[in-house]
Swiss-Prot record:
Residues 39-45 are annotated as: Cys-loop. Residues 195-206 have a biased composition (Acidic residues). Residues 34-155 form the OTU domain. Phosphorylation on Ser-202 and Ser-204 induces 'Lys-63'-specific deubiquitinase activity. The gene is Otud4. It comes from Mus musculus (Mouse). This is OTU domain-containing protein 4. Its main location: cytoplasm. Pfam families: OTU (PF02338).
Length: 1107
């Protein structure tokens, strides 16, 4: 609207730009014989121009405005279509004299006064006839600055108006004031008259000259004292009348009186504004650092003794006199001596600001000094505050000094801080820092900015990034160099106690919370006692361990370069008190109210000691210990684990902005990359060279470590689904071609579990030895790194390196790995690649991650051990491995046929413990490859049968087993775990009794473990039902001919028949089976086996666990 005060007139009136564009407009109008008369630059400029040209007086502009409003209301149907919004509200706004108007009002005025409007807008451009009503009279206007209208007259108007004006003033002074004007005009020299005439060339030049003079001399609102330019102001000693009167009396000069009156009132308002601004900026008693008192340019220090509208009275310290300076030059920012503890002031924008303590000095040297900062919290140094490394403990009254780099940062910040009353200056400065961050924003923009900031902080809290929670709080550092996080620890130095003073605990906690959310500190070198230095590269030197009350005892010392065996790690040496009340320096006093984990938590698979090259903050019940030298120290309890939520938090950011998107590693070209092998070299030489792959697995590791309660599937699967959705929506996006292994890459066949390719590895791996055929129980603590490693099928087929199943690993860390047999080749099974997530024959139906994940959920990528009952149903023996089985018959895996008889007979405790212990014992005996002797007859029969078949050599397994496995391999469309032995033909069974003992006792033993004793009084009915279904008597004689009586079963469970039934006549009609015949294993009653192994590979033992 209004142009800025004191701005050059060309900017205000130039229709297209700066001052040089304004002069061509005046020249163009003169060329056309026209003259532009300036009009007051306010909202009534149009009505002023029309009032002068129609009513011959600008003072009647309000009358013209009200007449226009009435005309618009009376002719509403003509103008309402051109008004946005409510027409009545628009007319109500027009009643304000400062409301700017436009085309609608010009059309109304044209119809009201029956005059067409012609408007000049640009130089050398024909004017615009905005109203074409064909009225004979015209109103000429000049449009400039996008909203301002000036009057355009013929150039003869200026000359005639100058003559009329001189006659009018001459009559006024001679007849009214009784002044002989003719003598005064004759007494003036010709040069002075010419100067008066030249000074009138353009009113805009007068305004511009005045503005330049003001800008040069009126610094900070103070005007130069005396009459430096007497020709511009008031009466001169040589002239009896003012310059303005003499100008009005000159017949050759036209004086724009209306514009001069508006300009004078504008300058008076400017003086009042300066006075208010000076009152806000200065007060009596403030200290001025640099005051220019004479013309030689010398600067001196002074105290302000008076604040007035124009000139301020100051007392010079060097001269000992009071002066009214012409101006106050602010000192350079580098030499400011900022005293903390006072509020800053907010003068007008563009002016330099000083702290009021810079002028008055510290009033109370014993008052606590707080750290000022003009930067918002997001830009502050992590430890922005008072530099306390340069003062001694005795000079308590001396002010702390700041480095020049910090002053430069302070000078870059705009001066947008207001001054507060003295009673408010004791408040914490943090509030002003936060307010300055949002200064100048509308309420909507401020709320939007705060919402974005809160969303970002929430995302940091969810991801528990190390950047969001530093190892050391910077606010506690800025308070005092020896201040500890524990309030019970006494302060060591005297100046810290002096500075402690009246520090408010709540404000300190708030600063801790803010800094711990924003800052991230690192320790770069060993600190010195009672020394605190904060460098500009955001690296802090922490107080030495002597500041702490006591040190936490570290575990057994080891050399840094020593290899750390991780197969049997010791539990973390952290006392229970640390879990209950951790005293971490950066932990805020008020933690989020999330459900925390149990006190017995611990990172899974983390060794007891890790050599740490930097200063490691170890938590203890009393203090924090900083160790700057390279020593193995206990793994610290992470703050993330203390506040780890039990359930996943909601996703706040877009899936496409997630650092783990698209849920799988991509190379630099954007193609899907195969997961790299484990990095075993301590130097990191075997890390991937591709930064994208390294970044993905780094982010995945940070998130998995920060959120141990979340399965990686819970946040990788939605990202993968989003990527697949993007591929469907945008066909140009290439669909990734998935490799065979969608989770882990198969390890090199030459590398075994016990041999590490790198000599300086972090850890060495070796298979756990079995004692007396049993695997040792898992230790009560975090599982070893050796357990979750994925073993490729090549190693499994060779019979070594198989890992035992540990129940603790499943319960603590579900969903971390896939089973070993997951790498089955997809060739020949499907034309299309399988998705890494979602429904597939490996993982089963996988829904989108719900808000709560149970521990036993079939969608999880559970670790791939065949002993894991949750994953038995999904285990498939790869076709390339089926023909290379070299394991003895009695050591067949549970997932292929049935439970091992040797395991059942040799470990009677497994019948009580369930499938977990049984599986672990069975696999351990299989790994050792030993055939344990047993006193029972069934075990001896198995040994005899297996001994004869094992002599045939590798690559020639028993015919019975291979035929049972190879035949359904080609008939099944999908890899499924089934009871393959039921499809063989009767003539292939050479010894039915022995073969039956091979297949049945395992199932019988499982049945005997879980099934209650039941009577078999319905046997005859079941047999009759079988006969009615079309079975021959030969089938009945073959199947049940050698059945044992109930007294000979040797078990209280529902045993069943110990022999394999023939399959030829059992198939029945061709369409009765999904797989060319039933595969149900019949029992005493003839009912189908309840644990159908096509659907549930877990058998009755697993069902018994969950019932």
């Amino acid at each position: 609207m209004e142009a800025a005060v004191g701005a050059p007139d060309g900017v205000d009136q130039g229709g297209v730009g700066p001052l040089e564009d304004e002069t061509p407009m005046d020249a163009y109008l003169r060329k056309l014989g026209l003259y532009r008369k300036l009009v007051a630059k306010d909202g009534s400029c149009l009505f002023r121009a029309v009032a002068e040209q129609v009513l011959h007086s600008q003072s009647r502009h309000v009358e013209v405005r009200m007449a226009c409003i009435r005309y618009l209301r009376e002719n509403r149907e003509k103008f309402e279509a051109f008004i946005e919004g409510s027409f009545e509200e628009y007319l109500k706004r027009l009643e304000n004299p400062q409301e700017w108007v436009g085309q609608v009002e010009i059309s109304a005025l044209s119809l009201m006064y029956r005059k067409d409007f012609v408007i000049y807008q640009e130089p050398n451009v024909s004017p615009s006839h905005v109203t074409e009503n064909n009225f004979p009279e015209k109103v000429l206007l000049c449009f400039s600055n996008g909203n301002h209208y000036d009057i355009v007259y013929p150039i003869t108007y200026k000359d005639s108006s100058a003559m009329c004006q001189s006659l009018l003033y001459e009559l006024l002074y001679e007849k009214v004031f009784k002044t002989d004007v003719s003598k005064i005009m004759m007494g003036l020299e010709a040069s002075e008259v010419a100067e008066e005439s030249n000074s009138e060339i353009s009113d805009s030049e007068d305004d511009s000259c005045k503005s330049k003079s003001t800008a040069a001399t009126d610094v900070n609102g103070f005007k130069p004292s005396g009459s430096e330019n007497p020709k511009n102001n008031g009466n001169s000693a040589d002239l009896p009348l003012s310059r303005k009167v003499l100008k009005s009396l000159n017949p050759a000069v036209y004086r724009n009186v209306e514009y001069e009156i508006w300009l004078k009132s504008k300058q008076a308002q400017q003086k009042r504004d300066y006075s208010i601004a000076a009152g806000l900026q200065y007060e009596v008693g403030d200290k001025c650092h640099q005051v220019r008192l004479d013309h030689n340019g010398k600067l001196s220090n002074a105290d302000i003794h008076g604040v007035h509208s124009e000139n301020g009275l100051v007392l010079s310290e060097e001269l000992g006199k009071k002066h009214t300076p012409k101006n106050l030059k602010p000192p350079p920012p580098e030499s400011w001596n900022t005293v903390s503890g006072k509020k800053m002031k907010k003068p007008n924008s563009g002016q330099n600001f000083h702290s009021d303590t810079d002028y008055r000095g510290p009033k109370n040297l014993n008052k606590p000094i707080k750290a000022p900062s003009a930067l918002p919290p997001r830009l502050q140094h992590p430890s922005s505050g008072v530099r306390q490394h340069a003062f001694s403990s005795h000079s308590t009254g001396s002010q702390s000094q700041k480095s020049s780099s910090e002053h430069k940062n302070l000078s870059r910040m705009p001066s947008q801080i207001t001054r507060k009353p003295d009673r408010e200056r004791a408040e914490d400065f943090d509030h002003v820092s936060r307010e300055s961050y949002y200064f100048g924003l509308s309420p909507e923009e401020r709320r939007e900015k705060q919402a974005i900031e809160e969303s970002r902080l929430l995302y940091e809290i969810q991801n528990r990034d190390e950047q969001a929670f530093p190892a050391l709080s910077s606010s506690s550092v800025s308070q005092s160099p020896s201040q500890n996080s524990n309030a019970c620890v006494p302060r060591k130095s005297s100046h810290a106690r002096d500075r402690k003073g009246s520090m408010r605990r709540a404000d300190a906690e708030e600063r801790k919370d803010k800094d711990s959310l924003r800052g991230h500190t690192h320790v770069d070198k060993k600190p010195e006692p009672s020394t605190l230095e904060i460098s500009d590269d955001k690296c802090t030197r922490v107080s030495s361990p002597s500041k702490s009350k006591k040190e936490c005892p570290s575990p057994v010392e080891q050399k840094p370069a020593e290899h750390i065996p991780l197969s049997n790690p010791a539990p973390l040496l952290v006392s229970p008190e640390v879990h209950l009340t951790p005293a971490v320096p950066s932990l805020p006093a008020t933690v989020p109210a999330w459900p925390s984990e149990p006190t017995t938590f611990g990172p899974t698979g983390v060794p007891a000691q890790i050599p740490i090259l930097s200063v490691t903050q170890t938590t203890g019940p009393d203090a924090a210990v900083s160790q700057a030298h390279l020593t193995p120290s206990p793994v610290p309890v992470s703050i993330q684990a203390v506040n780890q939520p039990l359930m996943p938090l909601p996703q706040t950011m877009s899936l496409y902005q997630d650092p783990l998107y698209p849920g799988f590693p991509c190379s630099e070209k954007g193609d899907r990359a195969i997961a790299p092998p484990y990095s075993l070299c301590q130097t990191g030489e075997d890390l991937p060279k591709d930064k994208n792959i390294l970044r993905f697995f780094f982010n995945l590791g940070v998130k998995a470590y920060s959120c141990p309660m979340w399965a990686p599937h819970s946040y990788l699967y939605p990202l993968h689904q989003a990527y697949m959705a993007a591929c469907r929506m945008y066909p140009k996006v290439p669909v990734p071609v998935y490799p065979q292994n969608t989770w882990f890459q198969e390890a090199p066949p030459a590398q075994s579990e016990s041999d590490c390719p790198c000599t300086d590895a972090h850890y060495s791996l070796h298979p756990e030895a079995s004692v007396n055929g049993q695997m040792p129980q898992a230790e009560m603590g975090p599982p070893a790194f050796a357990s979750p490693l994925v073993i490729p099928p090549s190693q499994v087929s060779e019979g070594h390196g198989q890992l035992s199943y540990q129940p603790e690993l499943e319960s603590e860390n579900p969903g971390q790995l896939l089973h070993a047999e997951y790498e089955e080749s997809l060739s020949g099974k499907n034309m299309y690649p399988q998705q890494s997530f979602g429904p597939n024959p490996f993982l089963g139906p996988v829904p989108i991650a719900p808000p709560f994940f149970p521990h036993v959920w079939y969608g999880y990528p559970f670790q791939g051990f065949v002993e894991n009952p949750v994953m038995r149903q999904n285990i498939v023996l790869p076709p390339d491995d089926k023909g290379e089985l070299d394991l003895p018959l009695e050591n067949l895996d549970l997932s292929k046929e049935c439970d091992s008889v040797s395991a059942v007979d040799e470990f009677p405790d497994a019948r009580v413990e369930g499938a977990h212990s049984l599986s672990a014992a069975s696999v351990s005996s299989k790994h050792e490859g030993r055939v344990e002797q047993s006193s029972q007859t069934r075990k001896a029969d198995i040994d005899l049968a297996s001994g004869s078949s094992a002599v045939e050599g590798k690559g020639h397994p028993p015919t019975q087993i291979l035929n049972r496995e190879r035949e359904p391999g080609s008939a099944e469309p999908e890899p499924k775990r089934t009871i393959q032995s039921l499809k063989e033909k009767p003539e292939k069974v050479k010894d039915p009794k022995t073969a039956a003992d091979v297949v049945s006792p395992g199932a019988n033993s499982v049945d005997r473990l879980q099934r209650p004793k039941e009577e078999s009084s319905e046997d005859e009915n079941e047999v009759s039902n079988i006969l009615r279904s079309g079975r021959s008597k030969q089938f009945y004689n073959q199947t049940y001919g050698s059945r044992k009586y109930k007294s000979d079963w040797g078990s209280s469970g529902r045993g069943g028949y110990q022999h394999v039934r023939g399959e030829e006549s059992w198939k029945g009609q061709p369409n009765r089976s999904r797989d060319e015949g039933y595969q149900y294993h019949r029992h005493v009653r003839g009912r189908p086996y309840r644990g159908d192994r096509r659907r549930s590979g877990m058998g009755d033992g697993h069902r018994g666990q969950h019932t």
